[in-house]
Amino acid sequence: MTPIRTNWSRDEIAALFEQPFTELLFQAATVHRAYHPPEQVQLCTLLSIKTGGCPEDCGYCSQSVKADSGVEATKLMDVQRVLQSAAQAKDAGSQRFCMGAAWRNPKDRDMPAIVEIVKGVRDMGLETCMTLGMLTPKQADMLKDAGLDYYNHNVDTGPEYYERVISTRNYQDRLDTLQNVRDAGINVCSGGIVGMGETREDRVGFVHTLATLERHPESVPVNALVPVKGTVLGDMLADTPLAKIDDIEFVRTVAVARITMPLSMVRLSAGRESMSEATQALCFMAGANSIFTGDKLLTAANAGDDKDAALFDKLGLTALQGEEPLRRAKDEAGKAAIPAE
């Protein structure tokens, strides 16, 4: 079995990207099969519980106050409405319910409602994940006490390209929040977005950042940029060859993430609705084992449940069931991890 390493060098990761595609795919599939049931994919649902009005200037985001995207700011959703949505997601087959709020960071006054939401969703038997922006250690502890399973805070891209995408929050801010989450005992969900005009070397840096954390994220979402008119990147990349990342390069990124982070759930996230069935199949072969279901991801379109069901039937895939045994196995394997240098 491939050992779990956190001491990957950038040169090693670059060499993985440079491999012949079929060899890379074979290597990723081999690693995937060693740690995960290859025919099972986790189904997740994402709900925006507070949309728009974010003071950050993330160039990809339609919810930024800097974007002229037409997204209207809303208040935090009522607790019961969130729980109703969670119940609907469970009925549709989701095992994981993710909730996002367009904040730079949650205010202390928002935390009681957030805690109530987490407890309510957990009581339904769903795995819970939240993305609320930067967290203080105290807020992370509150979420842990409420029973939150995962906290998402993406690094977005490699450290060298980051400042071309965001100026209101630095790279270390993101890493600090991930550490606060880890210190609180919450599972880490962290990934990024490809196709923002970055180079392959930037994608190497993105994977390297995550693969050399003291402990790999338990969940790694890989997004393909959905260029939204009125956002900095949406307008900058419109009608250019960079407006959509090459499908093979996207699959390469998924494969390299799988090889370097064998235990992580690698999630196909935004951008999947524009991918062909063949591209999605290659991603699953390369080690992606989690998707978002439903018609919408925050403010972006997503492949609907019916399309996903048809694709799963065509590929012989099934929804992941009983993740707890997998988590125990991952904990055991994680004890043998090679430490970061």
Curated annotation (Swiss-Prot):
The keyword rRNA-binding does not apply. It comes from the Bacteria. Pathway: Cofactor biosynthesis; biotin biosynthesis; biotin from 7,8-diaminononanoate: step 2/2. This is Biotin synthase. It comes from Erythrobacter litoralis (strain HTCC2594). One of its GO terms (molecular function) is iron ion binding. The gene is bioB. Belongs to the radical SAM superfamily. Biotin synthase family. Residues 39-263 form the Radical SAM core domain. Binds 1 [4Fe-4S] cluster. The cluster is coordinated with 3 cysteines and an exchangeable S-adenosyl-L-methionine. GO terms for biological process: biotin biosynthetic process. SMART domains: BATS, Elp3. Signal peptide: none annotated. Homodimer. Keywords: 2Fe-2S, 4Fe-4S, Biotin biosynthesis, Iron, Iron-sulfur, Metal-binding, S-adenosyl-L-methionine, Transferase. Its EC number is 2.8.1.6. Its cofactor is [4Fe-4S] cluster; [2Fe-2S] cluster. Pfam families: BATS (PF06968), Radical_SAM (PF04055).
